[in-house]
Amino acid sequence: FATTTDGATWSKMQGGYEPGFWLWRVRYHNGAFYSAAYAAVRPTPAARETRLLRSEDGLNWELVSIMTTERMAGEADLLWRPDGSVWVLTRTGDAAGDAEWFTSDAGMKTWTGKGTGTPVHSPVFATWKDRVFVAGRDYRKDGSTTKLWEFKDGACVEVVTLPSRGDTAYPGLLVDPS
């Protein structure tokens, strides 16, 4: 990152965390920023590592926990549940190719993972009333589509496939409070 006070003169670029880690879908919760950051090449793509990071200012990041070193996990989103638990849904790059669902208690130190049976790239969570939804790219050999699923009991139940062309990843979800 770089900083400026006038929009014309900028500081020297500096990293906010270790080189090689990508901060993915940063979330704000209880006065801090969080990201499930991953290293895509460490030392090889098969050795990916996903870490939960925390920041007070969004610029300087510290390690909370290592979530996983398995299944070539990468792009992920976080969701804090009313019971205090934390959920993470992450894209995987192994042969199975389905998204992995991780759960932890409020301390976010120990994570338990389970395959969902559904490929979800670039996942994003949203809660509406007492229901949890996830959107992302469903990547298949015959083409990619953007989908919305309801997330129930660790599984993705398809709600709708959106008209899709090209790279259909990186969706966002906005819940209308009315």
Predicted regions and their residues:
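Beta-rich carbohydrate-recognition and catalytic domains
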Residues: F1-D167, V175-S178
